[in-house]
Structures are given as structure tokens and as C-alpha cells.
Amino acid sequence: MMIMPEEGHPLSRMLASYPPQALRCDLPAGSLFGTDGIRGKAGDLLTAPFALQVGYWAGQVLQETAARRAPVIIGQDSRNSSDMLAMAIAAGLTASGLEVWHVGLCPTPCVSYLARTTDAIGGIMISASHNPPEDNGIKFFSDAGTKLLKDLSAKIEAGLRGDRLENILSQTNNCGSYQHQKELTQQYRNAVFATLPQGLSLDGLKIVLDLAWGASVHLAPELFQALGAEVIALHHQPDGNKINVNCGSTHIDQLQGAVQFHNADLGFAFDGDADRVIAVDNTGRIVDGDYILYLWGKQLQAAGQLPNNLIVGTVMANLGFERAWEKLGGQLHRTAVGDQYVQAAMWQTGAMLGGEQSGHILCHHHSVSGDGIQTALHLAALVREAGVPLNELIDQSFQTYPQFLKNVRVEDRDRRLNWQNCDVLQTEIAKAEAAMGDKGRVLVRASGTEPVIRVMVEAEEQYLAEYWTQHLVNVVQSHLG
């Protein structure tokens, strides 16, 4: 017989409308965890019963790892499904005996920060980052503010696959409590502010912010305005139907146009959960993560704050960036794509700066997670300190190699994840690499967050990069699609 929690508890409220048969989840084959937690279509894999089980087993694993009972932080982006998933996960966490502090709409790095600096034993963020509104995801953080290690994620998944929800609910005699604690986000706001140079003023700078209808809509404008900047905000309300749709860090066109129309000094585009940022200079030119790493790295190098002149990047980092950084006496350590791989390499090598071309930037002088808002503020501070427009700093940095990236949709999960077994594709990749020699490179990989295979080619000569990208795309479509 199922034992229900006391009336008014979030577990009771969430379960009230579910018949017992609806509380059963058929899990797909293969790992539930991708490169950034669990991600999928809301209402498909990501249902309330599934999220409740995730919360329960996450609670069990976090308690076992920390060897204590303490609160878990929950934050979320603005997607329509985020409220439902947050409450279901809160129900599961309280069913495991834990207290929940739900901070509501906030950037992912806010959850990381609060997990690290409060008495919490971990944090959970409900977001699918840059993905479209119909997707959602569940990201997990340890009490150190870092993404959960693979072995802990595996324990959560083992629990999900090993017990039925009815059995879990029969054990919920010792429920924890739920508190809405929106005010905790101010601690994160103050911490971001404290990382900036003392006395920094952005007075006189006109800055356009594309907030992507997401998690940065309140905090980013507030911080830039507090520093004296004139802020022009795009997509500046939380909207679960529009988050990331033709806006934000993966759709820069509107930001570029707004910077030019308003004669702004620079612009920043965040993704839905604000853990990444792409900048635009005063001419409307895109300033991606490679440029941000180069400029910030050069500043830290000059200040003696970049051990071994080392920056951690990924396999996507442009060759032009790498060779320019080497000319400054620096070294670039490449990892697989994913901010958790960048993070792991930074800990292993002692690097203080790392990130991705896509705009995930980590600076261990200030935080342990990628933080789009913090990165944007530091780039604005760098421009103010340099005393010249951002376009001049970019002109003096490096010339990128022409790089072409195309996504090929491959619905079959096994084919997608095991693309290396396609002999024809491997042969054609080898041909491309031989044709370009040391003047180009090929990268083919399965996305960890979307059902696509990404094909990237870069070369000194644009026609070579373009030709081989399309050729390899055709091969993927013919043999894997």
C-alpha cells in the first residue's frame, strides 16, 4: 500500500491527479545522461513521475556522497515545463528526506554558486540551455559547485532503472521540507559584482543585451545598469514559449543589428540559462569564446595571473586562435566538447582560464562554473580598461581560419553514438585530412545534447573547408541518416 506524505506537501500536491499506472516510467535504452545531465522533450522522457524519481535518487546519492542531510538548491529557467519539473524534483528530494531550497528563475551559475557557498549538499538546475522551448533538462551540481562526476550520475541512473515509483513512495515516512527562497539569488548577484575591478564604472558605454527570454532577464540588465552602462535590452521578459527562438547566443543576427542600429559600443547574447555568452563588437562583428579567451588570457598573462600561460579549450577551438596564443608564449590544452571536460582539465593542469568557442567561459579566479553574465561584465571591464573600442582589440588579436560547421540529424541513437564504426565515413575523413595536411583539420562528433552528428572542417583556404564539410555531410546523410 502506498503511504502518502502529509496534506499540503509538494509530493502530495503533485501526485494527487496521477492514477497509479501513470506513475510508471518506461526508460529508453542507453545512458540517460549526456554531456550536461539529462535532456529531452518535456512530456516525453521528462514527465512529472520521471522527475520525481530523479529527485528521489539524486537525493539518495547526494546524501551518501556528503555523508549528511542538508538542503538541495533548485533553480530553473523560463520554459513552460520548468515549473512542473522543478516541483516534481522537489517532491522526490523531500521524499528522500531532504530539505529543498527552491530559488526559482535564475542562471545556472547561480545554482552552482549557492551549492558551493551555502550549507547545501548539492544543486539541481532545470534547463536545456540553448535548446528550443519544447526541450528541457536536469543538471546536477555537487556541494563544490561542480557538475556531478560520472560515477555519481551512474548511481542516480542505476536507481532509476532499479526500482519502481510505487516502491519509492512506500518508503516516504520521513519527508523533508520545501522552501521557496528567491532571496538567495541576491547572494549570487553580490558575488558576481565582487569579482569586478574595484571602482569599475561603465558610464558612457552603450551596451545591448540579448536575454533570450530566459534566465538572465532580471540580473544581467541590473548589473550593467548598476555599473553605469546605458542598457538596451532585447527579449527581456521570461517567456517559456519563446526562450532561445531566433535569439540568444545561437542566433546573433538581431543582436548584431541592434548594436549597429543603436550605435552601441558592444553587445552580449546569453543562452536560456545564461551559462554562456557570445559578444558583438561595435561594428557588429561576432566575438566568440575563442576571442574572449584570447583577450582575457592576455590580460591575465600581463598581470601574472595565468600559470604557465595555459588556457584550456576544446577540439572546436580555432587554429587561428591557437597559433596566435602560441606566439604570445602561451599554450592551449584541448579537451572534448563540454564544459565539464574543460573544468576537469583545468583542475588537472592547474589552469585558471578555460572555455569553449560556443561561449562557455570558466575563470577559476572567480568561479567554478561557466558564467555568461560574469564573463560579459569582465569583457566590458577589459574594454573600459583598454580605452579603445572592442573592434580594435579584435583587429589586434588574431585572424580565424575559415571554419564550417554543419549538423546532420541522425535519429537512430546507436548509429549516432557509434558513428566511428562507419568505415566509409572514416575513409573520407582520412582523405580530407590528407588533402589539407597541417593547414586544416576535421572534427566529426555526435552531439551530447541533440540527435545530430556535427561535422566541422577548418582550413587556411576557405574553399577547402567548405568543400570537405559538404562532402562529409553527404557521407553522413547517405550512410548514417
From Swiss-Prot:
Q: Which EC number(s) does the record attach to this protein?
A: 5.4.2.10
**Gene Ontology biological process:** carbohydrate metabolic process; peptidoglycan biosynthetic process; UDP-N-acetylglucosamine biosynthetic process
- In this chain, where does the modification Phosphoserine occur? S129
Output the PANTHER family linked to this UniProt entry: PHOSPHOGLUCOMUTASE (ALPHA-D-GLUCOSE-1,6-BISPHOSPHATE-DEPENDENT), PHOSPHOHEXOSE MUTASE
Q: Which UniProt keywords apply?
A: Isomerase, Magnesium, Metal-binding, Phosphoprotein
Going by the record, the broad EC class of this enzyme is: isomerase
Kindly provide the name given to this protein in its UniProt entry.
Phosphoglucosamine mutase
Question: Residues in the active site?
Answer: S129 (phosphoserine intermediate)
Task: Output the Gene Ontology cellular-component terms.
Answer: cytosol
Similarity field:
Belongs to the phosphohexose mutase family.
Instruction: List required co-factors.
Output: Mg(2+)
Tell me what reaction this enzyme catalyses. Answer: alpha-D-glucosamine 1-phosphate = D-glucosamine 6-phosphate
User: Which positions bind Mg(2+)?
Assistant: S129, D271, D273, D275
Q: Which organism is it from?
A: Picosynechococcus sp. (strain ATCC 27264 / PCC 7002 / PR-6) (Agmenellum quadruplicatum)
Q: How is the cofactor bound?
A: Binds 1 Mg(2+) ion per subunit.
